UniProtKB/Swiss-Prot annotation:
<protein>
    <recommendedName>
        <fullName>Transcriptional regulator MraZ</fullName>
    </recommendedName>
</protein>
<keyword id="KW-0963">Cytoplasm</keyword>
<comment type="subunit">
    <text>Forms oligomers.</text>
</comment>
<dbReference type="GO" id="GO:2000143">
    <property type="term" value="P:negative regulation of DNA-templated transcription initiation"/>
</dbReference>
<dbReference type="InterPro" id="IPR035644">
    <property type="entry name" value="MraZ_C"/>
</dbReference>
<keyword id="KW-0805">Transcription regulation</keyword>
<dbReference type="InterPro" id="IPR038619">
    <property type="entry name" value="MraZ_sf"/>
</dbReference>
<dbReference type="GO" id="GO:0003700">
    <property type="term" value="F:DNA-binding transcription factor activity"/>
</dbReference>
<dbReference type="InterPro" id="IPR037914">
    <property type="entry name" value="SpoVT-AbrB_sf"/>
</dbReference>
<comment type="similarity">
    <text>Belongs to the MraZ family.</text>
</comment>
<keyword id="KW-0677">Repeat</keyword>
<dbReference type="InterPro" id="IPR007159">
    <property type="entry name" value="SpoVT-AbrB_dom"/>
</dbReference>
<dbReference type="InterPro" id="IPR020603">
    <property type="entry name" value="MraZ_dom"/>
</dbReference>
<feature type="domain" description="SpoVT-AbrB 1">
    <location>
        <begin position="5"/>
        <end position="52"/>
    </location>
</feature>
<dbReference type="GO" id="GO:0000976">
    <property type="term" value="F:transcription cis-regulatory region binding"/>
</dbReference>
<keyword id="KW-0804">Transcription</keyword>
<dbReference type="Pfam" id="PF02381">
    <property type="entry name" value="MraZ"/>
</dbReference>
Length: 152
């Protein structure tokens, strides 16, 4: 499971180095192969170990190609999906189209979300964190069914 946020750098070739603490987990779940795609709700990228991505693909396969919304959903996720392999130094090349989508340049944030990562431009991540804080503070969490009984 992946957790925590890590400040990382992207090199001039568009590569990021996956932090050491995650590399073993990525190799346990497979051969260090990951799938990178867009997040259709936020301006960031989603990074899945291959076996986790295959579960997503199985769900996508159940969606209809004749329903325009379902087809568009599939097209967005699958059309941007790139299978990538970590090199011997734990680096992965983020394809240019995906870097452009997420506005990635040099400074980035890799955020563990249990079964996947989000990859954000550092400034966009900070703005999203500020927006999330405002949203959470403005809500009565006990009125949210799935959060009502959640306690820390």
């Amino acid at each position: 499971m992946f957790r925590g946020a890590s400040a990382i750098n992207m090199d001039a070739k568009g590569r990021i180095a996956i932090p050491m603490r995650y590399r073993d987990q990525l190799h346990v779940h497979g051969t260090g192969v990951i799938v990178i795609t867009i997040d259709i709700q936020s301006q960031c990228l989603l990074i899945y170990p291959l076996q986790e991505w295959e579960l997503i693909e199985a769900k996508l396969l159940t969606l209809s190609d004749t329903n325009p919304v379902e087809r568009s959903f599939k097209r967005r996720l699958l059309g941007h999906a790139h299978e990538c392999e970590l090199d011997s130094h734990g680096r992965v090349l983020v394809p240019p189209t995906l870097r452009q989508y997420a506005g990635l340049d040099k400074k980035a944030m890799l955020v563990g979300l249990l079964n996947k990562f989000e990859l954000w431009d550092e400034a966009a991540w900070q703005q999203q964190m500020d927006d999330s804080q405002t949203l959470i503070q403005s809500q009565d969490l006990s009125s949210q069914d799935r959060l009502a009984d959640f306690s820390l």
